[in-house]
């Protein structure tokens, strides 16, 4: 009977151990199956890696080009407008009227001023303020003596006021540009011929008149083109 008890106890122990072993063996595949569900296989593709590198290099090249374009200095020379040229000629004419180191006939500068004066100045002279300025200057001229340099601006003021429409209409046209070139060429010939030489024309007393005559001549040529 003892042997039977021993054998039965062994059988019972073996019976109790089998489920424990079977549970351990079954738990491992379940863990592996869980890992298979939550993880994905990692594959190395060299072609995909090279394509990503090429895209990165292309993007960096574009960014560098944009930076270079943004930081580069762009030089652009805008053409001078006709209004700016008229202002240059007007200032040059006034400088010739007031300059002393020249032997030109300054009265010839007055029609050149009327031809090249900007439209804003002509409108101001022909307006109420210009008429009052001419009236007061004329009253002062009756009682006082003006120097020769100050008489020429006053004469130019009166010339613009009393000039008829047909004469002022040639301003800005080819006819007016041809007349202006003829006047400026005559003034340049007088100035440089009476100065004696180019060195004397650029001396301290004549440099202002020389620069003004060059400016008037160049502006007249540019307005004709």
From Swiss-Prot:
Residues 99-102, 150-151, 197-204 are chloroplast intermembrane. The lineage of its organism: Eukaryota, Viridiplantae, Streptophyta, Embryophyta, Tracheophyta. One of its GO terms (cellular component) is chloroplast inner membrane. Its main location: plastid. It is a multi-pass membrane protein. Residues 77, 124-128, 173-175 are stromal. GO terms for biological process: cellular response to cold; cellular response to water deprivation; cold acclimation; response to abscisic acid. Belongs to the Cold-regulated 413 protein family. Induction: Accumulates in response to abscisic acid (ABA), cold, freezing and drought treatments. It comes from the Eukaryota. Keywords: Chloroplast, Membrane, Plastid, Plastid inner membrane, Transit peptide, Transmembrane, Transmembrane helix. It is found in: Plastid, Chloroplast inner membrane. The chain crosses the membrane at residues 78-98, 103-123, 129-149, 152-172, 176-196, 205-225. InterPro entries: COR413. PANTHER family: COLD-REGULATED 413 INNER MEMBRANE PROTEIN 1, CHLOROPLASTIC-RELATED, COLD-REGULATED 413 PLASMA MEMBRANE PROTEIN 2. The gene is COR413IM1. Pfam families: WCOR413. This is Cold-regulated 413 inner membrane protein 1, chloroplastic. Residues 1-76 form a transit peptide.
